Amino acid sequence: MIPVFDPVALGLYMLGYLFMFVIAATVAPRVAGAVSGRLTLYGAMALTGVMIVLTTAFVIYLFVLVAAPTLATVSFLVGLIAFVVLMNLLTYVASPYIINASYGARPDPRLQQIVDEVAARLGAPFKLKAVVVDGPPNAFAYGNFLTGRYVAVTSGMLSLVDRRELEAVIGHEIGHHLHRDNAIMLLFGVLPSVVYYLGVTAVHMGLGSGNSRGGNAALLAVGVVAVLASFLIQLLVLAFSRLREYYADTAGAKAAGKEAMQFALAKIHKFYFMAPEARQAVSESKFRALFIYALVNAVANPFVTITRAEVEQIKRANYSALQEVFSTHPPIPKRLRFLDQLPL
């Protein structure tokens, strides 16, 4: 039985995090650079998704192979997967209620009208609930089959962008709903946890006395591999999330034009550059993965304006490749350059 304080699990977690940091700092940027431009957005999403699924399946196969496919092993595996899925499903169901309460979400008739217009433009086959929340410039999509689909826009965003730019931002969020990103990322987000707990369990089984020496060594090896693989899968899930943001940007561009999407993103980038305390607030939010801008530092500045020259300058701005690898969102400069390539 695993104790409440588990030094083995703690050691494995530290090892996995070190492994993830090394991969993120060395291998990931090179792979991303080599692949960039050679695959379409759809190709990159397909490849990343396949890598996530295959890596997870391979680790599960190794565990079953070494632990022997007995009824107890299969039962444990099914139970573990069911438990992790159930916990994530409960979070998925409860999160809209938590978000509404945490952010003080409130309906807004004018915003609802704009959301309805943009939704019709994008051919959305479902009803969307538009809400305003307090906070610095941001927007996010959330909801589920019980609560319905929400598009939230902060008061700071409403003060920052013009009508056309707001339509682009809303189009981006509706894109997340159209692409079913909440459900897809929930599914993929489960996999690193399953593989990690599988690895920790295998190590504990290997350290037990009930197996032969060779069997113990094999279980230990599979356990360590599984833990390391779970952190690798987490990096792949983050990469997949960044690709889904590009995908949502295409919806924003379709809704209001590439220029409106670029100007909205550039204004957001400029705002957070001018307000580092707001960047920190967003980066510490538990819901940052939902935001349109999440590489971020709480006061909205309604006087932020942007010119085409500034947009071009932001496109060439430097950004941290390491920070990008650990983020759910691509850097704004890369998103602006991506929008340039869209055939719209």
From Swiss-Prot:
It holds the Pfam family Peptidase_M48. CDD domains: M48B_HtpX_like (cd07338). Binds 1 zinc ion per subunit. The chain crosses the membrane at residues 8-28, 46-66, 74-94, 183-203, 220-240. It comes from Pyrobaculum calidifontis (strain DSM 21063 / JCM 11548 / VA1). It is found in: Cell membrane. GO terms for molecular function: metalloendopeptidase activity; zinc ion binding. Its EC number is 3.4.24.-. It is a multi-pass membrane protein. Its cofactor is Zn(2+). Gene3D superfamilies: Metalloproteases ('zincins'), catalytic domain. The keyword Secreted does not apply. Belongs to the peptidase M48B family. Zn(2+) binds at residues 172, 176, 245. This is Protease HtpX homolog.
